[in-house]
């Protein structure tokens, strides 16, 4: 994993770049012209850096972003990546670029620092406090919950990072934010070297993105990088073995959250007598579970993690409770689309891996499951084995439909299975299986790009097909 020793400011790289660097005229190569790359390039240009941007893509979207940056003074080259960094003193890479890319290995071999947009933002953060969230699943929901708690507590705050808003934009806001709720992926953490948030949570760790990281150990290490500094309060999940194991090595204060108050060591935030309880920060009872809209185990777990982060920042128990009572999840995350003839239709298109789909399925007693898409090299056996008791039927789409069907045949042979060519057909097939009291759940357990632009487009098409049935 790219760690402390490879970040400028740690004594590495030409010019020993530090937080007090003069950016004027500094040659910086920005790799990728997506959301974070575009934001990083703009921020660097605003500070007077000499910016060159490269991207392997050359679509109309790329061309539009390139035109914007050229107008601001950047050099932009599309349609391929160079073999090396040229005369750049710093490389700022988009998170999707793997560390094995020749451009990245070439820069590292030449002693040129490689940062991500998060590293830039941390060095430009001013006086803002950061509360950071990572994990295989639940990051966005937890970050949204945390943002709601901060707002309820009267903080001038916002959410940023993998949730949508680039962090370099958030730290540049005027007037400045007091606190940022930051969602970070393993990709982003790999290219982040000096960040030391006030508190950080690792929600869970399950196999994902293993091809990018090169294995499960490197993936877990990237997640653990979120709390590598001793000044960070590290928050781990007692119900997730890997998160709890990683927490044991954190150098700062350690806090556990979890659903079982009898677990050992006992979680500092847990559920007791139907209430979310904070013993770690002295908050006592925070809220009754019965007062929450979403009470599935993984949603309660997310709420405990968000509460731990908010309490670490000093948000009061009453504000946390009020925020959770009012909280509604964003689109495509266990979002109820409609109830038609006693059948509930739920969009969890954000469940893009088996671990996320398992958490979603565990929240419903009788499910017609719509699943499938582009597999990330993961197995579906554990998912099907754990979910078989709630499955009434499965409707499969996408490239990995056969893989899921094979897992169903092995572990849930009595569950009816039907394949569908697209979302309209999938909704039609699911409606034929579903009866009063069932939930039709889109929890694909796979990525979307084989059939759809992204998970949001997949969820939107599901919702449109469902609403068309309402007449």
UniProtKB/Swiss-Prot annotation:
ATP binds at residues 135-141. Pathway: Cell wall biogenesis; peptidoglycan biosynthesis. SUPFAM superfamilies: MurCD N-terminal domain, MurD-like peptide ligases, catalytic domain, MurD-like peptide ligases, peptide-binding domain. Pfam families: Mur_ligase_C, Mur_ligase_M, MurD-like_N. Its EC number is 6.3.2.9. GO terms for molecular function: ATP binding; UDP-N-acetylmuramoylalanine-D-glutamate ligase activity. Signal peptide: none annotated. It catalyses: UDP-N-acetyl-alpha-D-muramoyl-L-alanine + D-glutamate + ATP = UDP-N-acetyl-alpha-D-muramoyl-L-alanyl-D-glutamate + ADP + phosphate + H(+). Its main location: cytoplasm. HAMAP family: MurD. Cell wall formation. Catalyzes the addition of glutamate to the nucleotide precursor UDP-N-acetylmuramoyl-L-alanine (UMA). Belongs to the MurCDEF family. This is UDP-N-acetylmuramoylalanine--D-glutamate ligase. It comes from Frankia casuarinae (strain DSM 45818 / CECT 9043 / HFP020203 / CcI3).
């Amino acid at each position: 994993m790219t760690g402390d020793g490879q970040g400028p400011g740690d004594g590495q790289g030409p010019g020993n770049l530090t937080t007090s660097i003069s950016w004027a005229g500094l040659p910086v190569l920005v790799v990728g012209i997506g959301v974070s790359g575009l934001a990083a390039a703009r921020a660097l240009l605003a500070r007077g850096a000499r910016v060159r941007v490269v991207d392997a893509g050359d679509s109309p979207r790329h061309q539009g972003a390139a035109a914007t940056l050229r107008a601001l003074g950047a050099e932009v080259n599309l349609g391929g990546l160079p073999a090396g960094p040229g005369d750049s003193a710093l490389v700022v890479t988009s998170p999707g670029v793997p560390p094995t890319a020749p451009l990245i290995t070439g820069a590292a071999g030449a002693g040129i620092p490689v940062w991500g947009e998060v590293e830039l933002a941390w060095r430009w953060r001013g006086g803002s406090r950061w509360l950071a969230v990572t994990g295989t699943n639940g990051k966005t929901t937890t970050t949204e919950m945390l943002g709601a708690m901060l707002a309820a507590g009267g903080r001038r705050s916002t959410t940023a990072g993998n949730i949508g808003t680039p962090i370099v934009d958030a730290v540049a806001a005027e007037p400045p934010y007091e606190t940022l709720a930051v969602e970070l992926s393993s990709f982003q953490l790999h290219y982040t070297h000096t960040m030391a948030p006030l508190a950080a949570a690792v929600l869970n760790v399950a196999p994902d993105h293993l091809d990018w990281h090169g294995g499960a150990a490197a993936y877990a290490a990237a997640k653990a990088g979120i709390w590598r500094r001793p000044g960070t309060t590290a928050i781990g999940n007692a119900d997730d073995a890997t998160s709890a194991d990683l927490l044991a090595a954190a150098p700062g204060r350690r806090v556990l959250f979890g659903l079982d108050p009898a677990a050992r060591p006992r979680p500092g935030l847990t559920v007791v007598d139907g209430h979310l309880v904070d013993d770690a920060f002295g908050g006592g009872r925070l809220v009754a579970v019965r007062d929450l809209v979403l009470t599935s185990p993984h949603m309660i777990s997310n709420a405990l993690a968000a509460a731990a982060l908010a309490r670490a920042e000093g948000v009061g128990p009453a504000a946390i409770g009020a925020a959770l009572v009012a909280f509604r999840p964003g689109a495509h995350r266990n979002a109820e689309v409609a109830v038609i003839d006693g059948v509930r239709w739920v969009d969890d298109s954000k469940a893009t891996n088996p671990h996320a789909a398992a958490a979603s399925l565990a929240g419903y007693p009788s499910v017609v499951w719509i699943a499938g898409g582009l597999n990330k090299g993961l197995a579906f056996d554990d998912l099907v084995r754990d979910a078989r008791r709630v499955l009434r039927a499965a409707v499969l789409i996408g490239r990995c439909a056969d893989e899921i069907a094979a897992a169903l045949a092995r572990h849930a042979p009595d569950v009816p299975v039907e394949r569908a060519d697209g979302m309209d057909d999938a909704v039609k097939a699911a409606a034929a299986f579903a009866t009063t009291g069932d939930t039709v759940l889109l929890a694909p357990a796979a990525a979307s790009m084989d059939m759809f632009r992204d998970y949001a487009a997949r969820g939107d098409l599901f919702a449109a097909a469902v609403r068309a049935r309402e007449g």
